Amino acid sequence: MDKNAIDKSEYPRTAELENRCVNIIANLWHAQPAENYMGTSTVGSSEACMLGGLAMKFAWRERAKKLGLDIHAHKPNLVISSGYQVCWEKFATYFDIELRTVAMDEQHQSLNMEKVMDYVDEYTIGTVGIMGITYTGRYDNIAKLNDLVEAYNKTTPYKVYIHVDAASAGFYAPFMEPDIKWDFQLKNVVSINSSGHKYGLVYPGIGWVLWRDKQFLPDKLIFKVSYLGGELPTMAINFSRSTSQIIGQYYNFVRFGFNGYKEIQKRTHDVAVYLSSEIAKLGHFEIVNDGSELPIVCYKHKINDGVDWTLYDLADRLRMKG
């Protein structure tokens, strides 16, 4: 557990475990070996999202230069719903990207497919679909987004692609909702991230990011280090970190297997649906997400409920109970 994951030449078995995890996840997300998929572990989904975003930025820049676009005329942009996790705001700030957010509202509690392509232009490095909106637990319709992107790409040489932020659903949907197409089954989904320490069932913190093909991970983002006993490639932002999370992820994959993960996620789903039904019976709350998709229960206070307390008061009282 005290071994450094970056020192792969000193601890080759750790590198082997990481590669096995990448292969297992690639299979789970329907990556095709013929497309030369690639992936890496990260400290969490925040790092994984940034790697996915950086790959999109560098790939866009290479495509734009070949097409003769003045890449300095406007700031590159990334299109995402306003329900994004804060790591995307950090990515945009750190790497000088305009974050174009498609507003959510009562009728659109995930990415608004009627408006999303209005935000796309030749300076768009990519679009992000979210499998598990932070505020509602809803899924973006990735299959619909794929169709919209496919239609757009047929009209312009300035192609755009999709990164799926599946921090929550990446290790849930494949087991509980296998009929939903959101992953590498879709042509324009080029990268996916997920958190191993959420529904991957590992202690914090570990994330994963995969690309469907090496062409979507520019060579400039793969660094070769030779001062740890051998020349080895690395693509993660962080460097030194413990191997314990990688070992924990591999152990879970082997220990639970597909059926074990499915059983655990089903129990979580059942608890979420039960909780939402009981909360609804209290009469004070409107259920926004009942846990029937991602097992996240989301509710809000009913308007004109006639009580003199707020959800913040409720949260404070719940903290008193631990």
Please tell me what each predicted stretch does.
Residues D305-L314:
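Short, conserved charged micro-motifs
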Residues E35-N36, A73, N289-I296:
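Short Gly/Ser/Thr- and Asp/Glu-enriched loop/turn motifs at secondary-structure junctions
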Residues D2-A48, A59-R63, L67:
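Conserved N-terminal alpha-helix of the aminotransferase class I/II PLP-enzyme fold
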Residues D2-S9, P33-T40, H72-K75, L99-M104, ...:
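Glycine- and acidic
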Residues I133, F175-E293, K300-D305:
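Active-site C-terminal subdomain of aminotransferase-like
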Residues T40, G44-K220:
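Conserved PLP-enzyme active-site core in the AAT-like
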Residues E18-A26, Y84-E89, N112-V120, N238-Q245, ...:
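Structured alpha-helical segments in the cores of large, soluble enzyme domains
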Residues M320-G322:
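Conserved PLP cofactor-binding pocket of PLP-dependent enzymes
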